[in-house]
Amino acid sequence: MAIILGADAHGNALKELIKSFLQEEGYDIIDVTDINSDFIDNTLAVAKAVNEAEGRLGIMVDAYGAGPFMVATKLKGMVAAEVSDERSAYMTRGHNNARMITIGAEIVGPELAKNIVKGFVTGPYDGGRHQIRVDMLNKMA
C-alpha cells in the first residue's frame, strides 16, 4: 500500500516524522510536498495522487488540519477526515472508508501523530451498513 504525504511549511517537520515512522513500518511512501506552496496546492497534490490508484491513502499536515480538510473534500471521490486523536483516525477508516486524513501540527504532538497514523493506515473498512453513507458522500462531490 502506498501512502501519499504532503505538508505546507507549518506541517513539514511533523510530516517528516510521520514519513520516517511509516517507512520504518514498511510502507511505501510518496511525498508530494512542495515546501514553497501553500496548504491548498499541497492538499490537492495529495488528494489527486490518492485518487489515481486503488489502495492508496493520504496524509496532509499543516498547522491546524481544517483548511486541508476543506480542500480535500471538494474533490470527487475523496472522503477525508480532519483528525486529532487515534480513535477518530481508526474509525474514519472503518465507518467512512476515508482515504485521506488531515492533521494539525500545532494541535498534535509527535507521539500522538504516530498513533493517529498507525490507526488510520491499519484500520480496515467495515463496509456493510456503512457503505450506504459512503455512497451518499460519493454522490455529493
Curated annotation (Swiss-Prot):
Membrane-spanning segments: none
Listed Gene3D superfamilies: Sugar-phosphate isomerase, RpiB/LacA/LacB
Record keywords, A-Z: Isomerase, Lactose metabolism
Pfam families for this protein: LacAB_rpiB
Domain of life where this protein originates: Bacteria
Top-level EC class: isomerase
Pathway(s) this gene product operates in, as recorded in its UniProt entry: Carbohydrate metabolism; D-galactose 6-phosphate degradation; D-tagatose 6-phosphate from D-galactose 6-phosphate: step 1/1
Reactions accelerated catalytically: aldehydo-D-galactose 6-phosphate = keto-D-tagatose 6-phosphate
Gene Ontology terms, MF aspect: galactose-6-phosphate isomerase activity; ribose-5-phosphate isomerase activity
Enzyme Commission number: 5.3.1.26
Secretion signal, residue range per the UniProt entry: none
Cross-referenced InterPro entries: LacA, RpiB_LacA_LacB, RpiB_LacA_LacB_sf
One GO biological process term: lactose catabolic process via tagatose-6-phosphate
Assembly notes: Heteromultimeric protein consisting of LacA and LacB.
Family: Belongs to the LacAB/RpiB family.
Name this protein carries in UniProt: Galactose-6-phosphate isomerase subunit LacA 1
Organism of origin: Streptococcus pyogenes serotype M1
Gene: lacA1
